[in-house]
């Protein structure tokens, strides 16, 4: 048996068949592929699926992970969630939908799984049992949820949601609802190939195991982004071990200053007082990826020594 056939068998063993129980639409999943003349084509590679986001269960007995599959004709991909034993045995697919599921984590001591899904039309936070049953939506944020982080005691959830940043011509002149022009009077109106119309903000909500309440934008009214574009994600946030505060990364600058400087900071938001403190004030570099020591006494982060482009990371 040649190496290519062995690889194909390994890919086949990776997942089980997607068997939806009801009408779910076209599910992009694992497709049969024919290897001709032993050539590793694009189609063969895509048929393997891409494994990502492995998370070990709290009792260290299982692994939760996702597998993404592509459809060339539709120019789309789809990601499903799987669970297997820590030794690689008993693989089970626990989602089977046309919408991708991602950012999955164990909660409730491993009894449940929280994840993002676009099943309701946009990306929202969902919860299901560890075996994939009883899936239910718990967030209904207007502009969708783009990442989330449970507090250590699981009584609060931080999630990322977009807020409006700039006005369009149609906002200023409602009777011109088909207008596509833009009113630009300052930097930074475009980031690479993206018009800056919305920016991400961190929200904190209380969680009782069933629903989100007391949702608060902890940067409400601030014209700054967190996480920072274009690469920032949920790693830009960290809860303190006692669940009483959360650290976040932001570059609180606008206009020309935002365009010329990479000086970002780590901020600490206290849930009880709703006050924010700059933990890296005076540090002029690109401060990112906060974390805390187990006792919560020492915050750490990546940083740069200067406020301009550099590839050297320090801790």
Language model feature labels by segment:
Residues 24-28, 162-221, 249-252, 256-265, ...:
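Predominantly five- to eight-bladed beta-propeller fold
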Residues 48-63, 98-116, 135, 142-157, ...:
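Conserved beta-propeller blade repeats
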Residues 30-49, 215-221:
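A short helix->beta-strand "capping" segment at the edge of beta-propeller domains
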Residues 16-17:
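C-terminal motif of bacterial Sec signal peptides marking the signal peptidase cleavage site
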Residues 80-82, 124-126, 201-203, 265-267:
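A short loop-to-beta-strand structural motif that recurs across blades of beta-propeller domains
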Residues 42, 90-92, 133-135, 212-215, ...:
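Predominantly a core beta-strand signature of beta-propeller blades
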Residues 303-313:
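Conserved small/polar residues in nucleotide/adenosyl-binding loops
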């Amino acid at each position: 048996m040649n190496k290519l056939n062995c690889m194909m068998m390994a890919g086949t063993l990776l997942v089980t068949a997607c068997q939806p129980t009801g009408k779910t639409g076209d599910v992009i999943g694992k497709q049969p592929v024919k290897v001709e003349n032993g050539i590793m084509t694009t189609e063969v590679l895509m048929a393997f699926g891409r494994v990502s986001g492995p998370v070990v269960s709290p009792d260290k007995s299982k692994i939760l992970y996702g597998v993404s599959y592509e459809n060339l004709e539709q120019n789309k991909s789809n990601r499903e969630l799987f669970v297997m034993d820590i030794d690689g045995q008993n693989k089970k697919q626990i989602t089977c939908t046309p919408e991708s599921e991602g950012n999955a984590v164990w909660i409730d001591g491993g009894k449940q799984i929280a994840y993002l899904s676009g099943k309701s039309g946009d990306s929202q936070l969902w919860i299901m049992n560890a075996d994939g049953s009883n899936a239910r939506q718990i967030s209904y944020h207007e502009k969708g949820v783009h990442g989330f982080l449970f507090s250590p005691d699981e009584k609060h959830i931080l999630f990322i949601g977009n807020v409006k940043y700039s006005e369009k011509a149609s906002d200023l002149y409602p009777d011109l609802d088909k207008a596509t022009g833009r009113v630009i009077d300052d930097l930074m109106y475009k980031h690479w190939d993206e018009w800056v119309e919305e920016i991400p903000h961190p929200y904190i909500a209380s969680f009782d195991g069933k629903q989100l309440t007391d949702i608060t934008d902890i940067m409400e009214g601030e014209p700054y982004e967190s996480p920072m574009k274009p690469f920032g994600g949920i790693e830009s946030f960290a809860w303190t071990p006692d669940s009483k505060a959360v650290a976040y990364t932001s570059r609180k600058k606008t206009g020309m200053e935002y365009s010329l400087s990479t000086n970002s900071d780590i901020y600490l938001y206290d849930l009880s007082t709703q006050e924010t403190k700059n933990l890296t004030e005076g540090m002029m570099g690109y401060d990112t990826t906060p974390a805390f020591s187990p006792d919560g006494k020492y915050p750490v982060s990546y940083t740069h020594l200067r406020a301009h482009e550099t590839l050297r990371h320090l801790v």
